[in-house]
Amino acid sequence: MTVNKGISIRVNNVGDKVSYKENELLTNYTYHTNVVHTNSDKTQFEVTPLDKNYQFKVDLNKPERLGVMLVGLGGNNGSTMMAAVLANKHNVCFRTRDKEGLTEPNYYGSLTQSSTIKLGVDSKGKDVYVPFNSLVPMVNPNDFVVSGWDINGATMDQAMERASVLEVDLRNKLAPMMKDHKPLKSVYYPDFIAANQDERADNCLNVDPQTGKVTTTGKWEHLNHIRNDIRTFKQQNDLDKVIILWTANTERYVEILPGVNDTMENLLEAIKNDHTEIAPSTIFAAASILEHCPYINGSPQNTFVPGLIELAEKNDSLIAGDDFKSGQTKMKSVLAQFLVDAGIRPVSIASYNHLGNNDGYNLSSPQQFRSKEISKASVVDDIIESNPILYNDKLGNKIDHCIVIKYMHAVGDSKVAMDEYYSELMLGGHNRISIHNVCEDSLLATPLIIDLIVMTEFCSRVTYRNVDGQDGAEAKGDFENFYPVLSFLSYWLKAPLTKPGYQPINGLNKQRTALENFLRLLIGLPAIDELRFEERLK
């Protein structure tokens, strides 16, 4: 099956595990796990291996064009995203300040577009790698049709220029392609973002025509307005699928209130009653779910209240969140895991950031910063819990974790991150690791947006059924979609949303392994391991 630049992968000796029927891939897979029971003082462990049999079906027809609607289209991430798609689609080469000749456009930083996956070993035992997106058909970002909403009405060439993320030569070449694109009017409830954003809010759909001021009444009408925007965009561009992603300002946390947002019915009623704890992100998420369009939350606020998750469950609509994991936190999810897995005991992590883009400007408000602080702090929780030797009631079961974010206009999109990891070693020794990291914030976030959209679209084409006790070839029963919360996407998210009752996995290597093994099983390959018996056994 050829899915990437002429690459063809054929898996031999899979028997009846994998079959192709017209435009469908059917895979029979036995999932192996271990159920562990332990006594109260955790000195005795009883392990029971458990097998479950599933059949997966992949629709091999990826969309020729995929609709992408960004909330916050006119921001740094949104304008950079549109620019990246156009530059790659039209092969816009450009000059940079630090390189001779022309630079070709690329999708560096994107796991789906610029990374590889281990296929196996060759006859000499050497690892063989192929592009990540070559195992199964995935949509090409060049085929994205991009639109969206923003509370600021600047055209996209103006938004790109204001962001000043890209090289000047590239901006000049892309401006003619972007000047006719303007964000749709968005929802603006001032209480949810920093007051300093009011000066930008000139493109709002919730403006009272009599006073010319924004109003927070009529929230059900605002929801229906967004639903109509989605339908219109889909129809005008002849699209089969549209994915909505929030890359707008960080909102404050909403209160979880009984009778307001604790159930689907209460949430919808609260929207109709203009309840004060209904945020703009709630409006966009609910509209997307009701239109059966996947919705991804790229900011740290708690958009997915219990009522919204229930709404997604009832509508069988995919959702994912929260908060892009792009720089400092991604490194933290690797380094903290490494230290704890090595038997080293981190006792404090101090994380400092300053940045000068509008994200930093909005986060200078305490309520919005609190949302970000919660998101960034949770990344080490499951890592600590994985090692009761290092973290327990006697030694302490927490890490002192301090997070600081400051706005400094002068540095623009170049976010500066400084971290110090202070750890205990054997026999009273200590270790201190200090990291200074400077990066273009939006050029790290935009590839994540691309990956989230590509993988969400792919997951929407995968269904499964439980076939325990059945012959795979003669299996019966309806195929189902994934559970609506796409925890497979946790690799790209700071505070991964999970199925209620389950803990998130934050370790980056674990998250990547899950993605790789899922793609491998679909084409009949076993889960990857590093046993390497070819060299270790006689």
UniProtKB/Swiss-Prot annotation:
GO terms for molecular function: inositol-3-phosphate synthase activity. Gene3D superfamilies: NAD(P)-binding Rossmann-like Domain (3.40.50.720). Pathway: Polyol metabolism; myo-inositol biosynthesis; myo-inositol from D-glucose 6-phosphate: step 1/2. It is found in: Cytoplasm. It holds the Pfam family NAD_binding_5. GO terms for cellular component: cytoplasm. Its EC number is 5.5.1.4. Its cofactor is NAD(+). It is an enzyme of class 5 (isomerase). NAD(+) binds at residues 74-77, 150, 186-187, 197-198, 200, 247-250, 298-299, 323, 326, 357-359, 372, 412-413, 441-442. Keywords: Cytoplasm, Inositol biosynthesis, Isomerase, Lipid biosynthesis, Lipid metabolism, NAD, Phospholipid biosynthesis, Phospholipid metabolism. GO terms for biological process: inositol biosynthetic process; phospholipid biosynthetic process. It catalyses: D-glucose 6-phosphate = 1D-myo-inositol 3-phosphate. Belongs to the myo-inositol 1-phosphate synthase family. Key enzyme in myo-inositol biosynthesis pathway that catalyzes the conversion of glucose 6-phosphate to 1-myo-inositol 1-phosphate in a NAD-dependent manner. Rate-limiting enzyme in the synthesis of all inositol-containing compounds. Homotetramer. This is Inositol-3-phosphate synthase. It comes from Candida glabrata (strain ATCC 2001 / BCRC 20586 / JCM 3761 / NBRC 0622 / NRRL Y-65 / CBS 138). The gene is INO1.
